[in-house]
Design a protein with these regions (language model features):
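Alpha-helical transmembrane segments of multi-pass membrane transport proteins
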Residues: 1-414
């Protein structure tokens, strides 16, 4: 049986399991077992036990639960409200006015939380009722929030960058550095779109309110100091070489706890809720990574990635042709799976293919998250589903669900 046929069989089995509602981690491990038993002579039980044990104590992966915990703590603190208060006085004079708060707020919060879901829930809980109350169109408010929340995929310390680094055995610090410029480019593009849209149709944007004096705006900016300290402590310690990503994650947890308590409104009960939520999320991601690692090892025993990479090399495809095919593949896959699942599921197959045509893994990272804007759209559906579950108050929850379908929100973001 040829490798393409084997790969197609395994892909059909995987999608059948996912369509049947099986957990992603269980589906990945089950496909790996099928591949080992049916298409190789390797001892499946020994390979599975060795893989699970070998990948369960990764030092790089230790940063993952810490960054998740930091995001959960910030989600329950008032730092997002303070951030809105500090940004709003400076952005009122720009075309689009306070809609830029969604863009810059998501960018800043993504830089301290590392999670797109936490960014969407936190900034949305604060900005959506405020902007709608001031007369901004709901479509633009939710569209800018949905699009800007995906900045958490790229702006360090992104959780998915850590997963990508572990899956591809790349330096997480280098991945963080590689995500800075593309992330800033996206921030500028999102803000530019808001400005152009407001310039083309001024009736969409409410009239500017009372202009605050310069000293009053400076005074309001003091609320940005805690966020700036957190960014400086986490990102600055990594880029200056004072700490590894794991050490910086631990520092970020300590700083986020201190700042959450010092700004008020944060209690020990909320800290316990953050710990439990971070534990559940970390365990879920850990199981997915173990299943993906087992699948990668199983694919190695079958020889499919190696032979597929050689086949791609013999076809003489240009890098752009391969990227076009991968873009369509990721758009389809992103409609069914979240970002972490897509990364761990496709790495063992896609990485040898892109390396076979001479594409650097770090460049592939940027293409994966920014080089194809349409690639990001399928992620809006699961992300907005999380946003609607977690946003408060309930009145806003009902209003968004009743008036904006996921398809409408995706169209607005697009």
């Amino acid at each position: 049986m040829s490798d393409p046929v084997i790969g197609l069989i395994l892909l059909v089995v995987l999608f059948a399991m996912l369509a049947g509602g099986l957990w992603v981690a269980m589906a990945l491990a089950s496909v790996a077992l099928v591949a080992l038993i049916a298409f190789s002579n390797a001892p499946s039980g020994l390979v599975m036990a060795t893989t699970f044990w070998g990948h369960s104590h990764s030092w790089s992966l230790a940063a993952l639960p810490l960054f998740i915990l930091m995001g959960e703590i910030l989600l329950r603190s008032r730092l997002s409200k303070d951030m809105f208060s500090g940004l709003a006085p400076w952005l009122g004079g720009l075309p689009g006015r306070l809609l830029h708060v969604n863009v810059l707020g998501c960018a800043i919060f993504a830089a301290v939380s590392g999670s797109s879901a936490a960014t969407a829930a936190t900034i949305g809980r604060m900005s959506v009722p405020e902007l709608e109350g001031r007369g901004y169109p709901q479509g633009l408010v939710i569209g800018t929030l949905a699009g800007s929340a995906t900045l958490g995929l790229l702006i360090p310390p992104s959780i998915i960058l850590i997963v990508y680094g572990v899956a591809t055995e790349q330096s997480i610090a280098r991945l963080f550095v590689a995500g800075i410029l593309p992330g800033l480019m996206l921030v500028c593009l999102f803000a530019g779109y808001v400005a152009v849209r407001a310039w083309m149709d001024p009736s969409l944007i409410p009239a500017r309110g009372e202009r605050l004096p310069y000293l009053a705006r400076l005074k309001a900016s003091r609320s940005l100091i805690p966020v700036a300290l957190l960014i400086l402590g986490v990102i600055g310690s990594i880029y200056t070489g004072l700490a590894s990503p794991t050490d910086a994650a631990a520092l970020g947890v300590v700083l986020s706890v201190i700042l959450a308590f010092s700004t008020g409104g944060f209690t020990w009960r909320l800290l316990g809720d953050a710990l439990m939520s971070a534990t559940r999320t970390s365990c879920m991601i850990a199981f997915i990574l173990l299943g993906a690692a087992f699948l990668s090892v199983a694919m190695g025993f079958t020889g499919i990635p190696r032979n597929l990479a050689a086949w791609i090399g013999e076809m003489g495809l240009s890098p752009y042709a391969l990227l076009a095919v991968l873009t369509v593949f990721f758009i389809v896959l992103g409609c069914f799976l979240d970002g972490i699942s897509v990364v761990v599921l496709t790495t063992s197959i896609v990485l040898p293919m892109v390396q076979a045509v001479g594409i650097d893994p770090l460049w592939e990272l940027n293409r994966h998250f920014i080089g194809r804007p349409m690639r990001r759209e399928p992620h809006l559906t699961p992300r907005l589903r999380k946003l609607r579950r977690r946003r408060r108050p309930r009145r806003l929850h009902r209003r968004c669900r009743g008036k904006r379908s996921p398809a409408s929100i995706i169209w607005r973001a697009f």
